[in-house]
Design a protein with these regions (language model features):
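Solenoid-repeat scaffolds in large eukaryotic assemblies
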Residues: 42-45, 58-61, 76, 96-100, ...
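Pentatricopeptide repeat
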Residues: 25, 29, 45, 58-61, ...
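Hydrophobic packing position at a conserved site in alpha-helical tandem repeat units
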Residues: 17-18, 36, 49-52, 56, ...
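Pseudouridine synthase
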Residues: 245, 249-256, 291, 302, ...
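RNA pseudouridine synthases
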Residues: 153-341, 345-351, 413, 418-420, ...
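Short coil/turn connectors between adjacent alpha-helices in alpha-solenoid helical repeat scaffolds
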Residues: 53, 87-97, 133-146
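N-terminal mitochondrial targeting presequence
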Residues: 1-20
């Protein structure tokens, strides 16, 4: 896996411009948090948070967060989640563990009166800190273990409430299903019935990493209601001949559940999901099997403790850079009004200036970040990405297939090529989809 350091790119930590030696007092704490958040949102707060460990009470920090955001409760929640999340990066710091627990308790205590409640990120970050603290030798082990269990129970109740009757019905249905103890070979064979590109990259008792095919939705939501399918249809699809032009719109979560793979319950929208990649994007995605691991993964993504690389195929000619000189660099461009940073490097140039293959690493995790940064930051929209490509390069791609038909529907040239989370032993590389090869061979 290639890291940002190997790309030779200087990365920026979104953070407050305040000096690390700045002496924070109870009077200046609101301004301190405000500047950190305004310069880098939660990333900025995570960086400066250690400087307030052991110096202020939970009441002080909650009050300062509301003052810093002028009672914008969404932003105040972001600050508090960032402070709690930062504690997970300092597991051996007893002040950090105690602060996370006290912040959680204080926030819960005022939630009804202030109409300002913790959310699933709060629960996940708090559990991650307390669970880690319970594993350190000492007199507080049992205390933190009990606290972690309490927070996890709260998270589960919160998720069930948000999920409503449909979620409860689904969980009840899954609990009655007979277990399917597939061997590794049987699982691989079962996955291949749905797509040749679908494969397990890593799996243990707590999580699973999948190479998701391009064109397959991760899970069905309100926007994909028409694509929802019944178990009967799902079974029919899995029994169908490979290669059939089948109209069933299968989600990755549907398939994993049908194969009997256990998934966590804390995401009220979709079991197991802790991060997302778009329908048209292929590649590595991790799903949680247990609620405990769900919390830990949410915290890992929240604190930017995950390395993600993408491969993108883009035009050689830029619509904003007349020099068309490109090698490597960084893209510092807001996405959806929020700070976003990516690093990139050209890893292949195709003959006759037809196309470039880029390696992109995201330093933040905004929706459509790579797609926006390629299109608007580099002036090179990803091939087939109709949402951000108003040019005609898609014609060039279609000409390279003898009979594209539906084969390119809901697909574009963006692939999550690698995923690394050191804490959980994840370091995987995902092969590019088979359909990429058909076109890449044509433009060589």
């Amino acid at each position: 896996m290639i890291s940002a350091r190997q790309l030779g790119v200087k990365t920026r930590a979104f953070a407050s411009s305040l000096s690390d030696n700045y002496q924070v007092t109870i009077d200046t704490l609101p301004n301190f948090l405000e500047e950190a958040y305004s310069n880098g949102e939660t990333d900025g707060v995570i960086r400066i948070a250690p400087s307030i460990y052991g110096k202020f009470s939970a009441d002080d920090i909650v009050s300062a967060s509301l003052q810093a955001t002028k009672n914008n409760k969404g932003q105040a929640a972001g600050i508090l989640n960032a402070v709690i999340g930062s504690c997970s990066l300092h597991k051996s710091n007893s002040d950090a563990s105690l602060l996370a627990w006290n912040l959680y308790c204080t926030w819960e205590a005022i939630s009804d009166e202030m109409e300002f409640s913790p959310d699933i990120v709060t629960f996940c970050n708090t559990f991650s800190v307390l669970n880690a603290a319970s594993e350190y030798p000492g007199d507080d082990q049992d205390f933190y273990k009990a606290c972690a269990a309490q927070v996890l129970d709260r998270a589960q109740r919160y998720s069930k409430k948000l999920g409503g009757s449909k979620r409860r019905k689904l969980l009840n249905t899954l609990s009655r299903r007979p277990s399917k103890n597939h061997t590794a070979i049987q699982q691989i064979d079962a996955l291949k019935k749905f797509s040749d590109d679908l494969e397990i990259l890593f799996e243990n008792d707590d999580l699973i990493v999948i190479n998701k095919p391009s064109g397959m939705v991760l899970f069905h939501s309100k926007t994909t209601t028409n694509g929802k399918i019944s178990r009967k249809k799902l079974k029919h699809f899995s029994d169908a001949q490979k290669g059939e032009d089948n109209h069933f719109d299968l989600s990755l979560v549907d398939i994993l559940l049908e194969l009997g793979i256990q998934l966590s319950t804390l995401n009220n929208e979709a079991l197991g999901v802790v991060h997302r990649i778009d329908r048209g994007t292929s590649g590595a995605i991790v799903l949680a099997k247990t609620d405990e691991m769900h919390c830990k993964l949410v915290t890992a993504f929240f604190t930017r403790s995950v390395d993600k690389n993408y491969v993108a195929l883009v035009p050689w000619k830029s619509c904003i850079d007349e020099s068309n000189q490109i090698d490597q660099g960084q893209i510092d461009l807001e996405v959806g009004g929020r700070p976003a940073l990516s690093t990139y490097k050209v890893i292949k140039r195709y003959p006759d200036n037809k196309a470039l293959q880029l390696l992109v690493q995201t330093q933040t995790g905004r929706k459509h970040q790579v797609r926006v940064h390629c299109a608007k930051g580099l002036g090179r929209p990803i091939f087939l990405d109709t949402l951000y490509d108003d040019r005609t390069e898609k014609v060039f791609i279609h000409e390279k297939l003898s009979n594209p038909g539906k084969s390119l529907e809901n697909k574009f040239f963006l692939h999550a090529s690698s995923l690394r989370i050191d804490e959980f032993g994840i370091d995987v590389t995902a092969n590019i989809p088979n359909w990429w090869h058909d076109i890449l061979n044509e433009i060589e």
